């Protein structure tokens, strides 16, 4: 194949422009990213060698070599990892094979990339960081196990195009040469390279080597310096990193900086983790785990194709970089490494799904993570709140799916409520502890936002009685309450479902007597309204929950409410046919007006208009769309005109 000039995908070029032209405060990270990629490539070839020894090509030890060339102004990073084919080069570098590309770029544009470099790393495109320091990048690679003539040479100046051609390459792996910008030549200095490797990549388990030239006095056979012999230059390959797997060390031996840099290595995040969990398990299942809770959620946290799971090693041998079986889906934000002593080295994906040791490890990891979160909530409330604001919606999934840990998870939940300021939260335990005497249930309402829910007419009787109502504003909350019917012996009740009216037995008797009296006054009118709205509502009844508003819609005890219908439609799910109950406030002036009109002339067309207006008003107050906005606005305008004329005495 001759040299071919190709264009980057539009999204790749936009990404490159952002990287090249953003003013990073720390450009050193380009080397960390390239070393990390090289380490991953060696992991992969050694893993493949368990099934196919030929890919090793007689070179079983992984190595990463750094080659600074001051004369040429280049820095080369060479690995003997898995390498790439021509197709893989174009897929991994010329394009971004990710459905979230546009969302990611939109996220970058909305934020100052210089302040949020972690967004680049989260997307797994650390290779492009090379262009921060280089005005030309050359990559030569060959897939392990392929013919020596099947190498690939890729080159770009980051100007929107790249060249690619086949070439010969003796050894497997990848060699990246950075043609450094004039002002970036410090990255050719030995001390600079050493300091970067020591700071960012000391824990990488493969040797990171560099040829180092020393000036020394010649020595005799016994090692003594030879007088008068002058000096000679001697070049030797030196290893720059300690290669000690950080997770195998005791916590007392690891510094916070080392923990932080290892987190950045495994997560491709550029920020510090919020929490580090480092522990060893012994007994029926022996393993070491180094886990991290990120400070911020990645942009693709809710994308189904996102890679999930932590890295799995068996006796320090890399197995996979995303073992989904080690953690349940609701903990998919956790990053880190698990190193087992009990699993076989040739473990397959099928074995991972069924292996009893994996299940034991998962149980231990989940228990440790949840206990850490519980401890944070008790002792580091501010940190836990930061975590919950980022990952609360994901953690809530566990209440629905993980019955075994439901009791632990329910104590980690936080909600805003009618008794908290915006941005402040209450736990279920705190809610129960401050329930007033006589309150027997935990009340909640679901919706799209606190601002919308605060205006809900369903809250009126609860506010009047001083009962706190939880605001559940995450879509997942509808499933949370299905999996959490009660807490601490108190049932959870939705204030917009059924006949949930907080009252003592005596109050209930008074309400029933009042309702019977109102039914005598409004009974025929209620039948009329129900007849007019028969296609839209299941029932029309007088309300005990309204104190100020004229009307509201409520669902049956187990029916779909407006919020659940919205969520199902947003998910392109079929929404079952259902009618709700229209409740009318017997003490509202509109009821008296309608009753008067109804008593005078049951055929008055204005009565049918009032029925439509009340139903549409109930929809609008809950945030639901109305079927005929034009008719609604026309009726409102007509009422305004009539009211204005009456006020003017016309």
Curated annotation (Swiss-Prot):
One of its GO terms (biological process) is DNA damage response. Keywords: ATP-binding, Chaperone, Cytoplasm, Nucleotide-binding, Stress response. Residues 1-349 are annotated as: A. One of its GO terms (cellular component) is cytosol. Residues 350-566 are annotated as: B. It holds the Pfam family HSP90. Residues 567-650 are annotated as: C. The keyword Amino-acid biosynthesis does not apply. It is found in: Cytoplasm. InterPro entries: HATPase_C_sf, Heat_shock_protein_90_CS, HSP90_C, Hsp90_fam, Hsp90_N, Ribosomal_Su5_D2-typ_SF. CDD domains: HATPase_Hsp90-like. PROSITE patterns: HSP90 (PS00298). It comes from the Bacteria. GO terms for molecular function: ATP binding; ATP hydrolysis activity; ATP-dependent protein folding chaperone; unfolded protein binding. Belongs to the heat shock protein 90 family. NCBIfam families: PRK05218.1. Molecular chaperone. Has ATPase activity. Homodimer. This is Chaperone protein HtpG.
């Amino acid at each position: 194949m001759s040299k071919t000039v190709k264009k980057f995908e539009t999204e790749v070029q936009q990404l490159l422009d952002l990287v090249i032209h953003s003013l990073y405060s720390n450009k050193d990270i380009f080397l960390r990213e390239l070393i990390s990629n090289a380490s991953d490539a060696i992991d992969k070839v050694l893993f493949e060698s368990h099934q196919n020894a030929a890919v090793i090509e007689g070179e079983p030890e992984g190595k990463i070599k750094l080659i600074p060339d001051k004369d040429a102004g280049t820095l080369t990073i060479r690995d003997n990892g898995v390498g790439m084919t021509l197709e893989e080069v174009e897929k991994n570098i010329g394009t971004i094979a990710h459905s979230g590309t546009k969302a990611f770029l939109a996220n970058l544009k909305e934020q100052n990339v210089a302040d949020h470099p972690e967004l680049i790393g989260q997307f797994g495109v650390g290779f492009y960081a090379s262009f921060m320091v280089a005005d030309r990048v050359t990559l030569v690679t060959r897939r392990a196990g392929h013919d020596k003539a099947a190498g690939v040479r890729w080159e770009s100046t980051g100007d929107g195009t790249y060249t690619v051609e086949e070439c010969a390459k003796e050894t497997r792996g990848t060699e990246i040469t950075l043609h450094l910008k004039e002002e970036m030549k410090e990255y050719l200095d030995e001390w600079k390279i050493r300091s970067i490797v020591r700071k960012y990549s000391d824990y990488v388990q493969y040797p990171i080597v560099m040829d180092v030239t020393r000036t020394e006095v010649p020595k005799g056979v016994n090692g003594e310096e030879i007088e008068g012999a002058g000096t000679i230059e001697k070049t030797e390959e030196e290893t720059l990193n300690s290669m000690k797997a950080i997770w195998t060390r005791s916590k007392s031996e690891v510094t916070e900086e080392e923990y932080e840099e290892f987190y950045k290595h495994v997560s491709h995040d550029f920020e510090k983790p919020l929490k580090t969990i480092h522990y060893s398990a012994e007994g029926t299942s022996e393993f070491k785990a180094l886990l991290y809770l990120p400070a911020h959620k990645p942009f693709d946290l809710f994308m189904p194709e996102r890679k999930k799971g932590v890295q799995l090693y068996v006796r320090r041998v890399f197995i996979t970089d995303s073992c989904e079986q080690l953690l349940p889906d609701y903990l998919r934000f956790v990053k880190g490494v698990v190193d087992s002593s009990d699993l076989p080295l040739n473990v397959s994906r099928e074995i991972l799904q069924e292996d009893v040791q994996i299940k034991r490890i998962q149980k231990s990891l989940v228990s440790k993570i949840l206990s850490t979160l519980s401890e944070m909530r008790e002792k580091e409330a501010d940190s836990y709140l930061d975590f919950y604001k980022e990952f609360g919606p994901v953690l809530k999934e566990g209440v629905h799916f993980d019955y075994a840990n439901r009791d632990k998870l329910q104590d980690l939940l936080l909600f805003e409520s009618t008794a908290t300021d915006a941005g402040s939260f209450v736990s279920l335990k705190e809610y129960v502890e401050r329930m007033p005497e006589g309150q027997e249930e935990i009340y909640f309402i679901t919706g799209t936002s606190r601002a919308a829910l605060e205006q809900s007419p369903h809250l009126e009787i609860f506010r009047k009685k001083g009962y706190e109502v939880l605001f559940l504003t995450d879509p997942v909350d509808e499933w949370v309450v299905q999996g959490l019917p009660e807490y601490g012996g108190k049932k959870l009740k939705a204030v917009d479902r059924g006949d949930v009216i907080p009252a003592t037995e005596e109050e209930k008797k008074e309400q029933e007597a009042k309702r019977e009296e109102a039914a005598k006054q409004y009974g025929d009118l209620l039948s009329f309204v129900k007849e007019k709205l028969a296609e839209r509502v299941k029932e029309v009844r007088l309300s005990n929950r309204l104190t100020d508003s004229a009307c509201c819609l409520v669902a049956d005890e187990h029916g779909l409410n407006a919020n659940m219908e919205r969520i199902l439609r947003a998910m392109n799910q079929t929404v079952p046919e259902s009618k709700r109950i229209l409740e009318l406030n017997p003490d509202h002036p509109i009821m008296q007006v309608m009753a008067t009109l109804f008593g005078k002339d049951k055929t008055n067309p204005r009565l049918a208009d009032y029925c439509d207006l009340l139903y549409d008003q109930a929809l609008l107050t809950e945030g639901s769309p109305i079927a005929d906005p034009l008719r609604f606005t026309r009726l409102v305008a007509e009422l305004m005109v009539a009211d204005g004329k009456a006020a003017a005495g016309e």
